[in-house]
Amino acid sequence: TIFIADNVKIISAEIIVSGAQTVTIGEETLIARNTIFRCEISHLLFDAKTKQVLPQKKDIFVGKHVWLGEECYLLSGAKIGNGAVMGARSLTSSTIKANSLAVGTPASVIRENIIWSRNNFDSKKKTIYDCIDQDGLKYLD
């Protein structure tokens, strides 16, 4: 199941879901080119001692006003908090805290307590109040 809230902008994305998994994308989220959401894992993994199948399929949750940079990869179990930003080509299957900037493979938080705006970069803008888009203020946790 895929839930996409209002005012979500998706440049291009691939969403792979099977069975009972859910991908949820919160309102006012921006998803850049070639982003992949993958709940499904194609092959089975087993515990070597018990020979029992390991649980693999979990939901993916993206909060409100999240910015996913180009070619991000969200795997089963990923949870991205409100107002967070994932840098280009970042990958995660874990939790990224709200209002944080995460980059890398695997993604790690490099900055907390951020707000982002859809306005293009302009060196004259010194605060969020200089921007037309101030939606990030609504999602501070």
Pin down the residues of each PLM region.
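Active-site/pore-lining binding-face segments in mid-to-C-terminal subdomains
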Residues: W67-R118
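Short amphipathic alpha-helical patches
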Residues: N34, Q52-P55, R89, K126, ...
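Flexible, glycine/small-residue-enriched loop-and-beta-strand segment within the central core
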Residues: T1-K79, N113-I114
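Contiguous hydrophobic segments
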Residues: A5, S18, R38, T92-A102, ...
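Terminal amphipathic alpha-helical/low-complexity segments used for targeting or macromolecular assembly
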Residues: E28, S42-L45, T105-D141
